[in-house]
């Protein structure tokens, strides 16, 4: 079975791009190859994930298909979640941000759908939140 997590950003109540440079900086060491649909990530422990992202569309939200248990993935995601207005969410679950002050930047619809986002202190905490849902 496939599982996806989604990362989007909002600004002034509307969808906004996550700077591509920030996404590339977080995932860069783990990008095995790029293709038009996204990036294959490969981690030191053998874990692999696919990031669906369109580099040329200017939107720069993304989803991670079959997120690996590799700690490097979750640390990279937390780095991205520190961008104001950025939130990670998953089907049937909740929403996570990287800092309490960032909740104010989110679209109101996020809280309506998922409830108040939880602040993750480290990548392992994101994994635990997903596993509990």
What residue spans do the PLM features occupy?
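Acidic (Asp/Glu-rich) sequence patches and key acidic residues
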Residues: 1-133
């Amino acid at each position: 079975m496939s599982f996806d997590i989604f990362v989007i950003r909002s600004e002034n109540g509307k969808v906004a791009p996550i700077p591509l440079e920030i996404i590339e900086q977080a995932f860069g060491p783990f990008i095995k190859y790029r293709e038009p649909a996204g990036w294959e990530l490969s981690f030191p422990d053998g874990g692999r994930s696919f990031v669906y992202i369109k580099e040329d569309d200017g939107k720069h939200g993304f989803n991670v298909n079959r997120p690996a248990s590799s700690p490097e993935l979750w640390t990279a995601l937390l780095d991205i979640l520190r961008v104001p207005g950025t939130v990670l969410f998953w089907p049937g679950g909740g929403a996570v941000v990287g800092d309490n002050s960032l909740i104010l930047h989110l679209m109101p619809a996020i809280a309506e759908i998922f409830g108040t986002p939880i602040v993750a202190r480290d990548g392992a905490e994101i994994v635990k939140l997903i596993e509990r849902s």
